[in-house]
Amino acid sequence: MGVAMVSLAQRVVRAVGESPVSQGVADAQELMYGPVIDWARRSPLHTDALGHSVHPMLTDVTLGCWLGASILDLAGGSGARHSASLLVGVGLIASGPTAVAGAGDWAEMSGTERRIGAVHALGTDAATFLLLGSLVARPGDDARSGVAQW
């Protein structure tokens, strides 16, 4: 009974946080995005005026749009393609302030937390670029190529 159960998610987060590869990702992002990160730290989006970071709230807008687009793509049929494209676009627009707020938070992190944040940012960068490609491929009579990208 005294053995604590550690979930798979907790083990993955711990492994990412302790990985030297994650440190390499963090170092590369610091090098690549250095000036943006410095600006993000001073931006109005990096504030705790609400008692906490605004980054988690902004992610709800971005992810909500992309989830809605996914649902419309899967279940909405051809009549929902325009709405799905609109949601992808709004999600992409929202991803900018979301990333800035996250970068400002990340700039103040260190150690394991910073490595996990760097891997998180890498994943969201990849998703953003895939969705940008999806949006570009959507116009026209055959929007399936834009949907198939993700």
Functional labels for PLM-detected ranges:
Residues M1-W150:
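Short amphipathic, positively biased membrane-proximal segments
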